[in-house]
Amino acid sequence: TPPTEGLTIGDKAPTFTICGEKQLIDLKDLRGKYVLLSFWASYDALSRMQNATLNHAVAQADNVEMVSVSFDEYKSIFNETIKKDQISTSNCFVELAGVSSDLYQTYRLKRGFKNFLLDENGVIVAKDVTVSELSSYLN
């Protein structure tokens, strides 16, 4: 039986579409490769640091795509942060509704920001991965 949609390992990750300044991304369009979903905010030091570290690691790998979503409510702060942290902006988005957004609710992020590693079929294979865990999944 195919996995059901949910947020635990082995579940199919809830799909979403998000629009950035230059691009629109639909999670379903990324099937066929590993996807690292990173949820963070500039005011949350741990998630911000993790996002930056993972972003630099993903830039070195060719078999994973990173989708980075910030829940900052001010675009200026978001832009300043990604510049300062040298984040690749290709799949970097800001959800200006912040913690009131549907995406925040869907991924139940109220207990702290998280990241999810999805396999080629959109199934969650790991949560809150570190850089070393990420490279062991991809090798």
Regions found by a protein language model. Name each.
Residues 1-15, 19, 23, 28-30, ...:
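N-proximal helix/coil linker or "cap" segments that precede and/or mark the start of modular domains
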